Regions:
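Histidine/lysine/aspartate-rich catalytic loop segments that bind and position anionic ligands
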Residues: 42-44, 53-58, 62-64, 70-72, ...
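Active-site gating/metal-coordination segments in enzymes
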Residues: 1-56, 61-62, 182
Length: 184
């Protein structure tokens, strides 16, 4: 049913990507039970975002295991080289591991959401401002981070103009195959 709903969401509702929250299922991203969904994402030519890193506490009554180490994307990226994988939440506390996966695999990207930009790990700021500027996408995980606050903090950062444009807009346009708006 899930694969049918994914196809329907893309073909009939205009969805441009998929989202997976591995912690809810207690299954790491490289669990083979996800592979039919990955194959469908490839067929539909859409990226899939998934939380990597530790699980945040959204509810004290339901604590979930942290099953999304960024290294688990390694096997998926190898098995599905055409699948565009976006590891969201920066991979914290394994940010270096997340950067390593994005650097190693052409099809792995990083979403810098769920953490206020002023609290981004220094290595992710360096990566997105230099050799990884084509691999990082901005996000807020609203309502976790207020978009206005996040933009103000990004504007306060010492980012190169080209890197900032890619972070905030260009990388998402390319990855999600979105049209450029007129006058942009």
């Amino acid at each position: 049913a899930g694969i049918y709903q994914l196809r329907q969401a893309v073909e009939e509702m205009g969805f441009v990507g998929a989202h997976l929250y591995p912690h809810w299922f207690g299954l790491a991203p490289n669990d083979r039970r996800y592979y039919p969904y990955y194959a469908k994402c490839c067929e539909l030519d859409i990226p899939i975002m998934m939380q990597v890193g530790h699980n945040l506490i959204y509810s004290r009554e339901r604590r979930l295991p942290s099953v999304g180490r960024p290294i688990t994307l390694d096997e998926v990226a190898i098995d599905f080289p055409e699948l565009k994988l976006i590891g969201i939440h920066i991979g914290v506390p394994w940010t270096d591991e997340m950067i390593s996966m994005a650097w190693k695999h052409e099809n792995v990207f990083i979403g810098v959401d769920a953490y206020a930009p002023k609290h981004w790990p220094p290595q992710i700021v360096h990566y997105l401002n230099t050799y990884g500027q084509d691999k990082v996408l901005f996000g807020t995980d609203w309502p976790v981070i207020d978009p206005e606050r996040a933009m103000a903090e990004v504007n306060d950062m010492d980012l190169r103009a080209e890197a900032k444009a890619k972070l905030l807009r260009d990388n998402a346009l390319k990855l999600f195959r979105l049209p450029e708006s007129p006058g942009a």
